[in-house]
């Protein structure tokens, strides 16, 4: 959540920054009204409290002096009763402000490029040259069918559309990728975690999925539980409402989980193959960092994801997202896009974000800085999306007869 005090004192500046993310200034004006309502409610309540304190002191004085307190006591009781609706009004005003503030996205960094959507993202560098084929490369679904690797029909039968079944060598390759990703992340200093695949609403609110994106989540009926859309949720919230020692920063975490998303806004997009599924596997990196060095941690995470792709021999490019393509919680995001020769285009395979103190404020994650507590910075990113890496290997390592080679670094895992 953005700093409400900063928003109140710098409304025009915040409004201008959020326009970079496509947030209409008019939608923020309601917040100004709520700020005013809360200020007025608190002023009335504080005035009533001041009067109550004054009468309470007078009450004690009357008793010491032996004066008749009947009339004064009636006034004290009446004022106390009058404070009840004032307290309720202040509480309701604060809750209304908080509810609206939860739906306001994070401020983009000043360095984030201007732009409306992914077409305006900025390519920073290309890593590895795409392979030159002497035949027409096939797309992954054709290769999967030829090799019997992915069963889309049985995925639909078992669940619904956008589910699939991996079998044989594809299932083994999926497991190999997960182990390779986790091993690499651990070698870079990330501690491995195995976390619940369901989290409660408070955790999803902490990382920003709730309340704004509830329609994209799978909720467990009659339970305060949701299937996680990413391991970012449990890993970041590992320190929900906790105070860390400054010496322990940064905290680097990694974990493998399946991820579950309704893909509510993706109707008609990537309907064939495994690019966009309701359930997919991912290895996540999460960092809880000191505000002074979160940029260094961010660069390390980007490099780590790129190094994994390089080790797999997969051509990719590094792209900085423009304001209009930034996620809700992100202040800055770098995407890694892998080359898919069958589609003849780069596709996102990792998205690494620095949320600054946005998630930390929502999740109350702090560190002890001398005598005071400060909010940490939280960062997250894939290293990597497993299914999309599997697709990239299939398309980049295919032979003319449809068989698929295995990258050298994965052979020991298979």
Curated annotation (Swiss-Prot):
The superkingdom listed in its UniProt entry is Bacteria
Question: Principal place where this protein is found?
Answer: cytoplasm
The reply on keyword Phosphoprotein is no
GO molecular function annotations of the record = ATP binding; serine-tRNA ligase activity
Q: Which GO terms describe its biological process?
A: selenocysteine biosynthetic process; seryl-tRNA aminoacylation
Q: Which reactions are catalysed by this chain?
A: tRNA(Ser) + L-serine + ATP = L-seryl-tRNA(Ser) + AMP + diphosphate + H(+); tRNA(Sec) + L-serine + ATP = L-seryl-tRNA(Sec) + AMP + diphosphate + H(+)
Give a yes or no for keyword Cell membrane in this entry: no
Query: InterPro entries attached here?
Result: aa-tRNA-synt_IIb, aa-tRNA-synth_II, aa-tRNA-synth_II/BPL/LPL, Ser-tRNA-ligase_type_1, Ser-tRNA-synth_1_N, SerRS_1_N_sf, SerRS_core, tRNA-bd_arm
Its GO CC terms are:
cytoplasm
Please state where this protein is localized.
Cytoplasm
Q: According to the UniProt entry, what is the EC number of this protein?
A: 6.1.1.11
| Pathway connected to this protein | Aminoacyl-tRNA biosynthesis; selenocysteinyl-tRNA(Sec) biosynthesis; L-seryl-tRNA(Sec) from L-serine and tRNA(Sec): step 1/1
Entry comment, domain topic: Consists of two distinct domains, a catalytic core and a N-terminal extension that is involved in tRNA binding.
On subunit structure and binding partners, the annotation says: Homodimer. The tRNA molecule binds across the dimer.
Q: What is this protein called?
A: Serine--tRNA ligase
